[in-house]
Amino acid sequence: MPEAKLNNNVNDVTSYSSASSSTENAADLHNYNGFDEHTEARIQKLARTLTAQSMQNSTQSAPNKSDAQSIFSSGVEGVNPIFSDPEAPGYDPKLDPNSENFSSAAWVKNMAHLSAADPDFYKPYSLGCAWKNLSASGASADVAYQSTVVNIPYKILKSGLRKFQRSKETNTFQILKPMDGCLNPGELLVVLGRPGSGCTTLLKSISSNTHGFDLGADTKISYSGYSGDDIKKHFRGEVVYNAEADVHLPHLTVFETLVTVARLKTPQNRIKGVDRESYANHLAEVAMATYGLSHTRNTKVGNDIVRGVSGGERKRVSIAEVSICGSKFQCWDNATRGLDSATALEFIRALKTQADISNTSATVAIYQCSQDAYDLFNKVCVLDDGYQIYYGPADKAKKYFEDMGYVCPSRQTTADFLTSVTSPSERTLNKDMLKKGIHIPQTPKEMNDYWVKSPNYKELMKEVDQRLLNDDEASREAIKEAHIAKQSKRARPSSPYTVSYMMQVKYLLIRNMWRLRNNIGFTLFMILGNCSMALILGSMFFKIMKKGDTSTFYFRGSAMFFAILFNAFSSLLEIFSLYEARPITEKHRTYSLYHPSADAFASVLSEIPSKLIIAVCFNIIFYFLVDFRRNGGVFFFYLLINIVAVFSMSHLFRCVGSLTKTLSEAMVPASMLLLALSMYTGFAIPKKKILRWSKWIWYINPLAYLFESLLINEFHGIKFPCAEYVPRGPAYANISSTESVCTVVGAVPGQDYVLGDDFIRGTYQYYHKDKWRGFGIGMAYVVFFFFVYLFLCEYNEGAKQKGEILVFPRSIVKRMKKRGVLTEKNANDPENVGERSDLSSDRKMLQESSEEESDTYGEIGLSKSEAIFHWRNLCYEVQIKAETRRILNNVDGWVKPGTLTALMGASGAGKTTLLDCLAERVTMGVITGDILVNGIPRDKSFPRSIGYCQQQDLHLKTATVRESLRFSAYLRQPAEVSIEEKNRYVEEVIKILEMEKYADAVVGVAGEGLNVEQRKRLTIGVELTAKPKLLVFLDEPTSGLDSQTAWSICQLMKKLANHGQAILCTIHQPSAILMQEFDRLLFMQRGGKTVYFGDLGEGCKTMIDYFESHGAHKCPADANPAEWMLEVVGAAPGSHANQDYYEVWRNSEEYRAVQSELDWMERELPKKGSITAAEDKHEFSQSIIYQTKLVSIRLFQQYWRSPDYLWSKFILTIFNQLFIGFTFFKAGTSLQGLQNQMLAVFMFTVIFNPILQQYLPSFVQQRDLYEARERPSRTFSWISFIFAQIFVEVPWNILAGTIAYFIYYYPIGFYSNASAAGQLHERGALFWLFSCAFYVYVGSMGLLVISFNQVAESAANLASLLFTMSLSFCGVMTTPSAMPRFWIFMYRVSPLTYFIQALLAVGVANVDVKCADYELLEFTPPSGMTCGQYMEPYLQLAKTGYLTDENATDTCSFCQISTTNDYLANVNSFYSERWRNYGIFICYIAFNYIAGVFFYWLARVPKKNGKLSKK
């Protein structure tokens, strides 16, 4: 990577640098005829010198200004670096980012020269920061107990009450105690401290990013005279906080990501003659060249799912983003994580160059800081548990703590020493001072008191006061003028953004179009999917409309209902994409790139084309397949209305997504809206039949007006021939037209047709005059929801973060409160709940003698290794496309009991691959060589005879530490060992790992649970409780940890080795002190080749001697042996080996000694026999039944402790079914009542998708943990895993079904039907069985679709498709008799066919029908006949229907159906088939579960005859 001179320089300087490219240009601009050219040049030079001096005076408080001063006083003018032609005169390849000779340092200096040449145009300025009495507090968790299904309502109620109560005792805890500091322009500050000490909070505080916590009332922060509120409102982009996480839009390329930022930050006062586009492109190219990203220009950034650049490159993209922003005050939170030490050093050097040349300030929090990097900082701040224990010059910090009473060991970096004083287990006290009785501060409070009384503190306060005094009106005005000069013409001067609102929309629109182009497959899939659904749904009604008579009325309404719903809810999944992009939008808002509403505006605009294409494709296919009216005007109005439906609902769902803070929060109201909007469209319940209490829903429902317009459009002005008359038959062949009537609403006696307008007026109360009203109201909703969406995006803040706390089960909290250990006030105090286990003063120091350790461990009785694990000529090859690549190349080695062996090498050397091969964890490729235990090949029990600690700390978040350890012990230790003995062993492991303080704490998630170190200890503990008989593998146990935690973990491994455990551990570039903890080293270079295997020796002398004796340069006394070794073999960035050390190793005496030792092992060790008893060679230590029992108990416990999952299920169930129940309240047995009851049964099933979508992430979470950790270690079988999922999910679904039954069955009035039929108990019980069966069916379908799918979203889409198909062909929306013959098989295989038929029959069968007055058919009987006499032949033929008055002679009122069984027969529902249908539905559930188990085995379970082969 180049010297990396930040693009912050780029924008610092370039933000206002945009001027003349040459002296000649300046001369032309300022030509004055009264002087000759020589005199003019002298005057210009004098003016620049005076201006430069003025600027220097304004920043005189900054100490290191040599580079900046030399630039301003040199008189050298910069040149325009933006070249179109390398052959142009004055071309300098050092300034061309596309040149191999590009120098970012030269580029930054050139831009500084340009700025100095015309300060009136570029408005140079600086920004410092001073803070006084800075303190911060966060909301405490009450709250420090775990939520469960039972206590969550109480917690929510209590939390709500507290918002309305004004109590003296606030529910907060202090994160930062009062502290002070000052950072002048041009200075670099490093913040050091262990995780949880408050480093991140300090950076957020001084960068005015305080969302989630509050600053103290006495806190004073000044940014060159501006307050934090001023910065947030007007100068947000000048103070930037770069978070540790790397979040980017994955489908954008690196160049597209950076050029978008550059466009949004291109200043108005840029280089003269350079347009915005050229300037932005140049900045992006400079950023890529500076950070070694040029080769990734057209590569997607990617993420964990989308393939893109590497993790390290993604981190550099994050750095480049901030660099382009050009802020004057930057805060970097662990920005070097994921970078190797050399790249991290170059990054710090870039910040230093930027500070020196451009007068910027930077604050950097680093966990592992090398000495070279530390020496670049001007100041250092050391934090411990929220206390400031030092702030001042970096070169004086070491002496300060040595004077306090601490000793810095040899070869320990200054940064490590400064943080080590905060760790009782690592720091070394000055024994001479102790002997003299001098008190050495040891607790954070004592160190803070010592600091406040020190002369260093007084010097700091002088500097702070001076800085605050210098922050006058002049400095504020300079910042303001510079900011305004950078802004585009139409940008508000008070706005913190560089470009105007519409320019932001423009650039974001371009970015979004790039996103769509780069992920065009998704758009094409959506188009294809919608076209497919149009073909399927449209073909359901194929040829039905050909008749064109009154028999098509219901189907026309049904098809229109399908159309409006499908168009409207096609945007429901947009909520997912909103939450995918939200973290990026929030990050860019803090960078002051654009308004969140501008991003929302652009996202709406960018999706218009795809939405239109999808809508047009779907509606054209659907319209003409259904055979709606063939009229151009009618068709285009239909299309217009459905497009309005698409956009109105899209904006509505976007509002829901922007109003909520998490995806799970958004899905609940979205699901509720889906139900309410669809039910009150006007088809399920006509407007006139809606109950009074809920009619308001129809009036505010945009879909109701749009559906009204669609029906009016379809039915207006058409005469539909009558398809069926009453009465009819041979006896009525010669009757007059007035003596019969058409059987549909709107029919007029004597007419052989029905006007469409009459039908919709009588059925729906729709009138043609309201046709365009729906369009107008729909458009009004589109506009209204659009602006609401923009407003919510602009002002809705994300979810607040919580301070890092431990969470305990409520029973533990009660116990602690009884003992007085915990109160609400100190519930979140780390020292009370053990957040920092090493802070207790009585903790046993780790520097005990080995003899004492041996005695202690002898009492503990940890498992000891008894066998030697060794391997020889180990090779591993994989097939990558057409190439066979060798990952491991003839690797030899062994691990003996009682030794700690390090496995080292550069990235790509094959360290983790070697561990996976040795541990039998690879699933593909070819392994050759010998892997032996005491000279004998591994058996089936080998995977559970070892411990394997993965780099990722994977644990069940709802379990406590003790429960996690016991679960491992119960399932992995031999079955013969009693539960009591296993429990005792777990307690012993807790003791040796020093986890007593948080043994009952919940694992939780980051910020609310165990911290990084505690999780790593738990990972090791889980493997130790299994009592590994052979050895323990650890993969990068120190990755991502601070140096003190890394040292603590290494000390723990040393303990275990001293007790007789064999340990093989990969480690990435350890410090000199960490290196000394290992006994042996296996060092590999790229290609999986061994370059050293042997003892390290005292101070790594044996290893150093080996390399020095084979041509390596001498290792300096103060060097880190690990870094020196990497440099020697050419594994460090920028280093080159002087020879092939693999060949050196293969020809060395040490190699021959290794081979000799392996020969002896293979010859002698087998004589000892196998260490595994014959009966203990099974794959698992416990039976399948016992495994399933324990896994089920754990899963049930997880559900109980996951109230968000269960309560979401119950709340959705309660709302949906209660809403349906009271919408169809007491539906009755009129024709419309029966129709309502059928639709109520139909709507009962729409909860399918919301319930299923909640289940899938829960399953994926369980599966990921099992497949990543528990399956490879043979903790339990996949059979136990999958059956536990079934056993635990079913009871909760039955409970949800029971809740649904009570709040759905009784309000609708099904019980009244059963009572009238004299079958109250039987039908009530049967309805309950069906209700429970449906919820179990949802769970079974969830298991089926996720069993072979990797991603929950893909499984949800598949399930939604299957459900839509099943629901569409169940016989409700179109009857089987009307369905095309091709689709009859779908009707028969749909599980919902049998469910709805049975549920409808159980709900409404065996009851008399009573028609409403408007449902009666009226006609005149022949003269001299009563209605009864006239209708008698028809009633004998039809066998259904009744007359209201058989003796009437003037007008006959006839109801077409007499019993509910007649109505049920029309939809193929028969009460006699209720149990048959129930049995069939249960068979579908069983099939889903069996298929789910099979597909899981087929797709997810490794097979013995799979892709892995051994030779």
From Swiss-Prot:
User: PANTHER family, alphabetically?
Assistant: ATP-BINDING CASSETTE TRANSPORTER
User: What is the official name of this protein in its record?
Assistant: Pleiotropic ABC efflux transporter of multiple drugs
Positions on the Extracellular side per record topology: 543-558, 629-631, 686-774, 1261-1291, 1350-1354, 1408-1476
This entry's comment on induction and repression of expression is:
Expressed during exponential growth. Transcription is transiently activated within 40 minutes after induction by benomyl and other toxic chemicals. Multidrug resistance and PDR5 mRNA level are activated by the transcription regulators PDR1, PDR3, YAP1, YAP2, STB5 and by the mitochondrial rho zero mutation. Mutations or deletion in the PDR1 or PDR3 transcription factors strongly activate PDR5 mRNA and PDR5 translation. The transcription regulator RDR1 represses PDR5 expression.
Question: What is known about this protein's pH dependence?
Answer: Optimum pH is 7.0.
Cite the record's Polar residues compositional bias ranges: 1-14
Q: Which SUPFAM superfamilies match?
A: P-loop containing nucleoside triphosphate hydrolases
Family annotation (Pfam families) = ABC2_membrane (PF01061), ABC_tran (PF00005), ABC_trans_N (PF14510), PDR_CDR (PF06422)
**Result of altering residue 302 to D:** Confers generalized drug resistance
- Composition bias of kind Basic and acidic residues appears in 833-846
Q: Which organism is it from?
A: Saccharomyces cerevisiae (strain ATCC 204508 / S288c)
What's in the keyword line of the UniProt record?
Answer: Antibiotic resistance, ATP-binding, Cell membrane, Cycloheximide resistance, Glycoprotein, Isopeptide bond, Membrane, Nucleotide-binding, Phosphoprotein, Repeat, Transmembrane, Transmembrane helix, Transport, Ubl conjugation
Tell me the outcome of changing residue 1427 to Y. Activates ER-associated degradation
Q: Tell me the lineage of the source organism.
A: Eukaryota, Fungi, Dikarya, Ascomycota, Saccharomycotina
